[in-house]
Protein backbone atom coordinates (compact mmCIF):
# COMPACT_ATOMS: atom_id res chain seq x y z
CA UNK A 1 0.00 0.00 0.00
CA UNK A 2 2.74 2.47 0.95
CA UNK A 3 4.58 1.84 -2.34
CA UNK A 4 1.40 2.51 -4.31
CA UNK A 5 0.59 5.67 -2.35
CA UNK A 6 4.15 6.90 -2.87
CA UNK A 7 3.66 6.61 -6.63
CA UNK A 8 0.35 8.49 -6.41
CA UNK A 9 1.98 11.20 -4.30
CA UNK A 10 4.82 11.63 -6.81
CA UNK A 11 2.37 11.83 -9.68
CA UNK A 12 0.29 14.52 -8.01
CA UNK A 13 3.24 16.47 -6.64
CA UNK A 14 5.06 16.50 -10.00
CA UNK A 15 2.43 16.36 -12.76
CA UNK A 16 3.68 15.07 -16.13
CA UNK A 17 4.48 17.71 -18.71
CA UNK A 18 4.20 15.58 -21.84
CA UNK A 19 2.38 12.53 -23.05
CA UNK A 20 5.60 10.55 -22.78
CA UNK A 21 6.01 11.47 -19.13
CA UNK A 22 2.34 10.70 -18.50
CA UNK A 23 2.59 7.24 -19.99
CA UNK A 24 5.71 6.55 -17.94
CA UNK A 25 3.92 7.72 -14.79
CA UNK A 26 0.90 5.58 -15.59
CA UNK A 27 3.15 2.57 -16.14
CA UNK A 28 4.80 3.06 -12.74
CA UNK A 29 1.42 3.55 -11.08
CA UNK A 30 0.06 0.43 -12.77
CA UNK A 31 3.05 -1.64 -11.70
CA UNK A 32 2.70 -0.45 -8.10
CA UNK A 33 -1.00 -1.26 -8.11
CA UNK A 34 -0.33 -4.74 -9.47
CA UNK A 35 2.05 -5.39 -6.57
CA UNK A 36 -0.60 -4.10 -4.16
CA UNK A 37 -3.31 -6.25 -5.75
CA UNK A 38 -1.22 -9.43 -5.68
CA UNK A 39 0.50 -9.07 -2.32
CA UNK A 40 -2.28 -7.49 -0.28
CA UNK A 41 -5.71 -7.52 -1.94
CA UNK A 42 -5.73 -11.24 -2.64
CA UNK A 43 -5.72 -11.25 -6.44
CA UNK A 44 -3.47 -13.52 -8.47
CA UNK A 45 -1.16 -12.50 -11.29
CA UNK A 46 -3.12 -14.81 -13.60
CA UNK A 47 -6.36 -12.98 -12.78
CA UNK A 48 -4.84 -9.55 -13.32
CA UNK A 49 -3.30 -10.63 -16.62
CA UNK A 50 -6.78 -11.44 -17.94
CA UNK A 51 -7.85 -7.81 -17.57
CA UNK A 52 -7.58 -5.55 -20.64
CA UNK A 53 -5.80 -2.88 -18.60
CA UNK A 54 -4.18 -1.07 -21.51
CA UNK A 55 -7.43 -0.96 -23.46
CA UNK A 56 -9.22 0.59 -20.48
CA UNK A 57 -6.43 3.12 -20.05
CA UNK A 58 -6.49 4.11 -23.71
CA UNK A 59 -10.27 4.40 -23.90
CA UNK A 60 -10.35 6.51 -20.72
CA UNK A 61 -7.78 8.90 -22.15
CA UNK A 62 -9.76 9.18 -25.38
CA UNK A 63 -13.02 9.79 -23.49
CA UNK A 64 -11.51 12.73 -21.64
CA UNK A 65 -10.14 14.30 -24.82
CA UNK A 66 -13.48 13.94 -26.59
CA UNK A 67 -15.40 15.33 -23.62
CA UNK A 68 -13.13 18.38 -23.47
CA UNK A 69 -13.54 18.92 -27.21
CA UNK A 70 -17.33 18.54 -26.98
CA UNK A 71 -17.66 21.08 -24.16
CA UNK A 72 -14.56 22.90 -22.86
CA UNK A 73 -16.69 24.21 -20.00
CA UNK A 74 -17.08 20.79 -18.40
CA UNK A 75 -15.32 20.60 -15.05
CA UNK A 76 -12.98 17.81 -14.03
CA UNK A 77 -15.66 16.57 -11.65
CA UNK A 78 -18.25 16.54 -14.45
CA UNK A 79 -15.95 14.49 -16.65
CA UNK A 80 -15.13 12.17 -13.78
CA UNK A 81 -18.85 11.56 -13.21
CA UNK A 82 -19.42 10.90 -16.91
CA UNK A 83 -16.30 8.75 -17.03
CA UNK A 84 -17.60 6.49 -14.27
CA UNK A 85 -20.54 5.54 -16.46
CA UNK A 86 -18.29 5.12 -19.48
CA UNK A 87 -16.13 2.71 -17.48
CA UNK A 88 -19.24 0.69 -16.61
CA UNK A 89 -20.15 0.54 -20.29
CA UNK A 90 -16.59 -0.40 -21.24
CA UNK A 91 -16.67 -3.18 -18.66
CA UNK A 92 -19.88 -4.51 -20.17
CA UNK A 93 -18.30 -4.37 -23.64
CA UNK A 94 -15.49 -6.56 -22.36
CA UNK A 95 -17.85 -9.01 -20.64
CA UNK A 96 -19.91 -9.25 -23.84
CA UNK A 97 -16.82 -9.94 -25.94
CA UNK A 98 -17.06 -6.61 -27.77
CA UNK A 99 -14.21 -4.17 -28.48
CA UNK A 100 -13.57 -1.82 -25.57
CA UNK A 101 -14.18 1.56 -27.18
CA UNK A 102 -15.98 4.88 -26.92
CA UNK A 103 -18.86 4.31 -29.29
CA UNK A 104 -21.09 7.31 -30.06
CA UNK A 105 -23.78 5.88 -27.79
CA UNK A 106 -21.45 5.21 -24.85
CA UNK A 107 -19.97 8.70 -25.14
CA UNK A 108 -23.35 10.43 -25.46
CA UNK A 109 -25.12 8.51 -22.71
CA UNK A 110 -22.23 9.04 -20.30
CA UNK A 111 -22.16 12.79 -20.91
CA UNK A 112 -25.90 13.02 -20.32
CA UNK A 113 -25.18 12.41 -16.63
CA UNK A 114 -23.54 15.74 -15.75
CA UNK A 115 -26.11 17.57 -17.87
CA UNK A 116 -29.24 15.89 -16.48
CA UNK A 117 -28.58 13.86 -13.34
CA UNK A 118 -27.01 16.70 -11.37
CA UNK A 119 -29.77 19.05 -12.50
CA UNK A 120 -32.49 16.70 -11.31
CA UNK A 121 -30.67 15.99 -8.04
CA UNK A 122 -30.23 19.69 -7.20
CA UNK A 123 -32.54 20.43 -4.24
CA UNK A 124 -32.39 24.18 -5.02
CA UNK A 125 -34.28 23.79 -8.32
CA UNK A 126 -38.08 23.78 -7.92
CA UNK A 127 -39.80 20.46 -8.59
CA UNK A 128 -42.12 22.10 -11.14
CA UNK A 129 -39.13 23.35 -13.15
CA UNK A 130 -37.59 19.89 -13.13
CA UNK A 131 -40.89 18.34 -14.19
CA UNK A 132 -41.18 20.66 -17.19
CA UNK A 133 -37.63 19.86 -18.29
CA UNK A 134 -38.25 16.16 -17.78
CA UNK A 135 -41.29 16.17 -20.04
CA UNK A 136 -39.41 17.85 -22.89
CA UNK A 137 -36.51 15.43 -22.43
CA UNK A 138 -38.95 12.49 -22.53
CA UNK A 139 -40.43 13.75 -25.78
CA UNK A 140 -36.97 13.97 -27.36
CA UNK A 141 -36.03 10.47 -26.18
CA UNK A 142 -39.29 9.19 -27.66
CA UNK A 143 -38.26 10.58 -31.03
CA UNK A 144 -40.61 13.55 -31.13
CA UNK A 145 -39.34 16.53 -33.06
CA UNK A 146 -39.15 19.65 -30.95
CA UNK A 147 -36.84 22.63 -30.81
CA UNK A 148 -34.63 23.00 -27.73
CA UNK A 149 -35.81 25.64 -25.27
CA UNK A 150 -32.33 26.85 -24.36
CA UNK A 151 -28.63 26.16 -24.79
CA UNK A 152 -28.61 23.38 -22.21
CA UNK A 153 -31.41 21.54 -23.99
CA UNK A 154 -29.56 21.97 -27.28
CA UNK A 155 -26.56 20.11 -25.86
CA UNK A 156 -28.77 17.37 -24.43
CA UNK A 157 -30.68 16.96 -27.69
CA UNK A 158 -27.37 16.80 -29.60
CA UNK A 159 -26.27 13.93 -27.36
CA UNK A 160 -29.51 12.06 -28.06
CA UNK A 161 -28.85 12.59 -31.77
CA UNK A 162 -25.46 10.85 -31.39
CA UNK A 163 -27.25 7.75 -30.13
CA UNK A 164 -29.73 7.92 -33.01
CA UNK A 165 -26.83 8.05 -35.47
CA UNK A 166 -25.53 4.72 -34.17
CA UNK A 167 -28.83 2.95 -33.57
CA UNK A 168 -31.87 3.14 -35.82
CA UNK A 169 -35.07 3.52 -33.84
CA UNK A 170 -36.72 1.03 -36.19
CA UNK A 171 -34.03 -1.66 -35.94
CA UNK A 172 -33.14 -1.21 -32.26
CA UNK A 173 -36.32 -0.29 -30.38
CA UNK A 174 -35.00 -1.82 -27.12
CA UNK A 175 -32.20 0.76 -27.03
CA UNK A 176 -34.63 3.66 -26.91
CA UNK A 177 -37.05 1.81 -24.63
CA UNK A 178 -34.19 1.46 -22.15
CA UNK A 179 -33.48 5.19 -22.37
CA UNK A 180 -37.12 5.98 -21.67
CA UNK A 181 -37.03 3.58 -18.72
CA UNK A 182 -34.07 5.33 -17.08
CA UNK A 183 -35.69 8.69 -17.82
CA UNK A 184 -38.91 7.57 -16.14
CA UNK A 185 -36.91 6.27 -13.18
CA UNK A 186 -35.09 9.60 -12.86
CA UNK A 187 -38.37 11.48 -12.94
CA UNK A 188 -39.95 9.21 -10.34
CA UNK A 189 -36.85 9.45 -8.15
CA UNK A 190 -37.59 13.15 -7.58
CA UNK A 191 -39.92 11.89 -4.87
CA UNK A 192 -36.79 10.92 -2.93
CA UNK A 193 -35.68 14.54 -2.53
CA UNK A 194 -37.35 15.20 0.79
CA UNK A 195 -36.14 15.10 4.36
CA UNK A 196 -38.77 12.79 5.76
CA UNK A 197 -41.73 10.67 4.76
CA UNK A 198 -44.41 8.81 6.64
CA UNK A 199 -44.17 5.00 6.50
CA UNK A 200 -45.42 3.86 3.11
CA UNK A 201 -45.66 7.39 1.72
CA UNK A 202 -42.67 6.95 -0.60
CA UNK A 203 -41.49 3.62 -2.02
CA UNK A 204 -37.84 4.36 -1.27
CA UNK A 205 -36.61 0.84 -1.98
CA UNK A 206 -38.53 0.52 -5.23
CA UNK A 207 -37.49 3.93 -6.54
CA UNK A 208 -33.84 3.34 -5.64
CA UNK A 209 -33.85 -0.06 -7.33
CA UNK A 210 -35.52 1.34 -10.43
CA UNK A 211 -33.08 4.25 -10.72
CA UNK A 212 -29.99 2.09 -10.36
CA UNK A 213 -31.21 -0.88 -12.38
CA UNK A 214 -32.42 1.05 -15.41
CA UNK A 215 -29.17 3.04 -15.55
CA UNK A 216 -26.90 0.05 -16.17
CA UNK A 217 -29.55 -1.76 -18.21
CA UNK A 218 -29.39 1.17 -20.64
CA UNK A 219 -25.59 0.78 -20.71
CA UNK A 220 -26.07 -2.83 -21.75
CA UNK A 221 -28.36 -2.00 -24.63
CA UNK A 222 -26.22 0.93 -25.75
CA UNK A 223 -23.09 -1.21 -26.02
CA UNK A 224 -24.67 -4.17 -27.81
CA UNK A 225 -28.07 -3.18 -29.19
CA UNK A 226 -29.67 -6.28 -27.69
CA UNK A 227 -29.34 -8.51 -24.62
CA UNK A 228 -30.35 -12.03 -23.69
CA UNK A 229 -32.83 -12.34 -20.83
CA UNK A 230 -30.02 -13.49 -18.51
CA UNK A 231 -27.83 -10.54 -19.53
CA UNK A 232 -30.73 -8.16 -19.06
CA UNK A 233 -31.35 -9.55 -15.57
CA UNK A 234 -27.67 -9.27 -14.63
CA UNK A 235 -27.20 -5.70 -15.88
CA UNK A 236 -30.35 -4.55 -14.08
CA UNK A 237 -29.18 -6.19 -10.86
CA UNK A 238 -25.67 -4.78 -11.30
CA UNK A 239 -27.17 -1.32 -11.51
CA UNK A 240 -29.17 -1.83 -8.33
CA UNK A 241 -26.09 -3.02 -6.46
CA UNK A 242 -24.06 -0.04 -7.71
CA UNK A 243 -26.84 2.30 -6.56
CA UNK A 244 -26.84 0.70 -3.12
CA UNK A 245 -23.07 1.16 -2.86
CA UNK A 246 -23.40 4.84 -3.79
CA UNK A 247 -26.21 5.35 -1.30
CA UNK A 248 -24.28 3.55 1.44
CA UNK A 249 -21.25 5.76 0.83
CA UNK A 250 -23.30 8.97 0.73
CA UNK A 251 -25.36 8.53 3.90
CA UNK A 252 -24.05 11.72 5.48
CA UNK A 253 -24.36 13.90 2.38
CA UNK A 254 -27.79 12.54 1.49
CA UNK A 255 -29.03 13.16 5.03
CA UNK A 256 -27.76 16.76 4.99
CA UNK A 257 -29.24 17.49 1.56
CA UNK A 258 -32.59 15.85 2.20
CA UNK A 259 -32.43 12.76 -0.02
CA UNK A 260 -34.24 9.63 1.04
CA UNK A 261 -32.46 6.29 0.67
CA UNK A 262 -32.95 3.03 2.51
CA UNK A 263 -29.82 3.90 4.48
CA UNK A 264 -30.74 7.46 5.46
CA UNK A 265 -34.13 6.18 6.60
CA UNK A 266 -32.45 3.68 8.92
CA UNK A 267 -29.60 5.94 10.09
CA UNK A 268 -30.25 7.47 13.48
CA UNK A 269 -32.54 4.61 14.50
CA UNK A 270 -29.80 2.20 15.51
CA UNK A 271 -26.87 0.59 13.74
CA UNK A 272 -26.94 -0.35 10.06
CA UNK A 273 -25.35 -3.76 10.74
CA UNK A 274 -28.30 -5.81 9.52
CA UNK A 275 -28.90 -3.61 6.48
CA UNK A 276 -25.22 -3.82 5.52
CA UNK A 277 -25.31 -7.61 5.80
CA UNK A 278 -28.33 -7.75 3.51
CA UNK A 279 -26.45 -5.54 1.04
CA UNK A 280 -23.56 -8.02 1.03
CA UNK A 281 -25.93 -10.93 0.38
CA UNK A 282 -27.76 -9.02 -2.33
CA UNK A 283 -24.51 -8.20 -4.12
CA UNK A 284 -23.29 -11.78 -4.01
CA UNK A 285 -26.60 -12.99 -5.38
CA UNK A 286 -26.40 -10.54 -8.29
CA UNK A 287 -22.78 -11.37 -9.07
CA UNK A 288 -23.60 -15.08 -9.19
CA UNK A 289 -25.26 -14.20 -12.50
CA UNK A 290 -21.92 -13.43 -14.15
CA UNK A 291 -22.05 -16.85 -15.78
CA UNK A 292 -24.30 -15.32 -18.46
CA UNK A 293 -21.08 -13.92 -19.95
CA UNK A 294 -18.45 -16.00 -21.73
CA UNK A 295 -15.56 -15.11 -19.43
CA UNK A 296 -13.20 -17.31 -17.43
CA UNK A 297 -14.10 -18.23 -13.86
CA UNK A 298 -10.98 -16.46 -12.48
CA UNK A 299 -12.38 -13.23 -13.93
CA UNK A 300 -15.75 -13.78 -12.28
CA UNK A 301 -14.00 -14.46 -8.98
CA UNK A 302 -11.93 -11.28 -9.37
CA UNK A 303 -15.11 -9.23 -9.88
CA UNK A 304 -16.82 -10.82 -6.88
CA UNK A 305 -13.75 -10.30 -4.68
CA UNK A 306 -13.45 -6.70 -5.85
CA UNK A 307 -17.09 -6.02 -5.00
CA UNK A 308 -16.63 -7.41 -1.49
CA UNK A 309 -13.56 -5.24 -0.91
CA UNK A 310 -15.36 -2.16 -2.19
CA UNK A 311 -18.30 -2.73 0.14
CA UNK A 312 -16.02 -3.41 3.11
CA UNK A 313 -14.11 -0.19 2.43
CA UNK A 314 -17.33 1.81 2.10
CA UNK A 315 -18.56 0.58 5.47
CA UNK A 316 -15.17 1.23 7.05
CA UNK A 317 -15.35 4.86 5.91
CA UNK A 318 -18.77 5.39 7.51
CA UNK A 319 -18.01 3.56 10.74
CA UNK A 320 -20.19 5.81 12.89
CA UNK A 321 -23.28 4.01 11.56
CA UNK A 322 -22.24 0.52 12.71
CA UNK A 323 -21.66 -1.31 15.97
CA UNK A 324 -18.11 -1.87 17.20
CA UNK A 325 -18.63 -5.64 17.12
CA UNK A 326 -19.77 -5.57 13.48
CA UNK A 327 -16.81 -3.42 12.45
CA UNK A 328 -14.35 -5.73 14.20
CA UNK A 329 -15.80 -8.74 12.42
CA UNK A 330 -15.77 -6.94 9.07
CA UNK A 331 -12.21 -5.72 9.57
CA UNK A 332 -11.09 -9.35 9.77
CA UNK A 333 -12.01 -9.61 6.08
CA UNK A 334 -10.22 -6.39 5.11
CA UNK A 335 -6.60 -6.43 3.93
CA UNK A 336 -6.01 -3.27 5.99
CA UNK A 337 -7.02 -1.96 9.37
CA UNK A 338 -9.78 0.63 9.04
CA UNK A 339 -7.77 3.06 11.15
CA UNK A 340 -4.83 2.77 8.73
CA UNK A 341 -7.06 3.41 5.72
CA UNK A 342 -8.65 6.41 7.40
CA UNK A 343 -5.23 7.84 8.27
CA UNK A 344 -3.97 7.39 4.70
CA UNK A 345 -7.15 8.84 3.22
CA UNK A 346 -7.07 11.90 5.47
CA UNK A 347 -3.40 12.46 4.66
CA UNK A 348 -4.18 12.25 0.93
CA UNK A 349 -7.02 14.76 1.25
CA UNK A 350 -4.82 17.18 3.21
CA UNK A 351 -2.07 17.00 0.62
CA UNK A 352 -3.96 16.77 -2.64
CA UNK A 353 -7.70 17.30 -2.22
CA UNK A 354 -10.25 14.93 -3.73
CA UNK A 355 -9.56 11.89 -5.89
CA UNK A 356 -10.88 13.89 -8.83
CA UNK A 357 -7.51 15.64 -8.89
CA UNK A 358 -5.80 12.31 -9.51
CA UNK A 359 -7.93 11.77 -12.58
CA UNK A 360 -7.31 15.30 -13.81
CA UNK A 361 -3.56 14.90 -13.40
CA UNK A 362 -3.30 11.55 -15.16
CA UNK A 363 -5.86 12.12 -17.91
CA UNK A 364 -7.17 15.64 -18.34
CA UNK A 365 -3.80 17.22 -19.00
CA UNK A 366 -3.60 15.21 -22.22
CA UNK A 367 -6.45 17.29 -23.60
CA UNK A 368 -4.62 20.52 -22.83
CA UNK A 369 -3.52 22.67 -25.73
CA UNK A 370 -0.25 23.30 -23.91
CA UNK A 371 0.93 19.73 -24.39
CA UNK A 372 2.97 19.73 -27.60
CA UNK A 373 4.93 16.50 -27.25
CA UNK A 374 3.37 13.86 -29.54
CA UNK A 375 5.34 11.11 -27.86
Model features per residue range: what roles?
Residues 43, 317-318:
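Amphipathic alpha-helical coiled-coil segments
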Residues 145-174, 272-317:
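Primarily interfacial, aromatic-capped hydrophobic alpha-helices that serve as membrane anchors
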Residues 211-214, 239, 302-311, 322-332, ...:
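Alpha-helical transmembrane segments of multi-pass membrane proteins
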Amino acid sequence: MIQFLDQVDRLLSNPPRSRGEARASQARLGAAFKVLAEETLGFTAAQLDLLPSQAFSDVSEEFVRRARAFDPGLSGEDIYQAGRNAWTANGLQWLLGLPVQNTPSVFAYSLLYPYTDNYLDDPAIPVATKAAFNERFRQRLAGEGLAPADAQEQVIFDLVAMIEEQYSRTDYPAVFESLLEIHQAQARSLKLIRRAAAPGEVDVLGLSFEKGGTSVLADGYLVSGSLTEAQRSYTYGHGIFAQLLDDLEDIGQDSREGRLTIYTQAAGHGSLDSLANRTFLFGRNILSGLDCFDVAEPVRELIRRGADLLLIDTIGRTDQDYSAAFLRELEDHSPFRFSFLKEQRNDFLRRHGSLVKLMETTLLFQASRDVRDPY
